[in-house]
A protein has these predicted regions:
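Conserved catalytic motifs of ABC-family nucleotide-binding domains
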Residues: 153
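ABC-type ATPase nucleotide-binding domains, specifically the catalytic core motifs of the NBD
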Residues: 12, 30, 68, 91-110, ...
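Conserved ABC transporter NBD signature motif
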Residues: 56-65, 76, 110-115
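Conserved ABC ATPase signature
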Residues: 132-136, 140
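The feature captures the beta-strand-to-loop junction immediately N-terminal to the Walker
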Residues: 33-35
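ABC ATPase C-loop
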Residues: 149-150
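Helix-to-loop junction immediately C-terminal to a conserved catalytic motif
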Residues: 48
């Protein structure tokens, strides 16, 4: 489903990824393991379109993602939960979830059903639905970040340091 071939990514003159190739199969859990500085986050940012690959190919179900803007990559089904969570601190939990479905807002009834499903899946969020996300504990913010990402109905969920929090 996700095929990465000979990907090279740089931060200016610093070459961070050199010839990375891997595949992630549908229905399988794929983990990237390595020490700090190995390029795990850089690879996820490159897949998500936040960083641009200088060379190589990233395909989701045969469709090339390299060169696509991040919002288009999200539309294609790839969603990133970054290491630092990046919840909207001044917005309530419910609105954070709604933000995760921003590309699907044309069907508000379906989005509302998905919000309810996230409240069921992550019960701690229900009791905090009207509470600003910035007041949640680190673990609760991580839970919210994952739930918000799932609101986009991803085919691939990229999670950077998912147990941090």
């Amino acid at each position: 489903m996700l095929q990465i071939s000979d990907v090279h990514t740089s931060y200016g003159q610093i070459r961070a990824l050199r010839g990375v190739s891997m595949a992630a199969e549908e229905g399988k859990l794929t983990c990237l393991l390595g020490p700090n500085g190995a390029g795990k986050t850089t690879l996820m940012f490159t897949i998500a379109g936040i960083l641009r690959a200088r060379q190589g190919s990233i395909k989701l179900s045969g469709v090339e993602l390299v060169g696509s803007p991040p919002h288009q990559i999200v539309s294609s089904g790839v969603v990133l939960v970054p290491e630092n969570r990046l919840v909207f601190p001044d917005m309530p939990v419910r609105e954070n979830l709604l933000a995760g479905a921003y590309l699907r807002l044309s069907d508000r009834a379906e989005v509302d059903r998905d919000i309810e499903a996230m409240m069921e899946r992550f019960p701690g969020l229900r009791q905090r639905a009207s509470q600003n996300a910035g007041t949640l504990s680190g673990g609760e913010q991580q839970m919210l970040a994952v739930a918000r990402a799932l609101m986009a109905r991803p085919k691939i969920l990229l999670m950077d340091e998912p147990s941090l929090g």
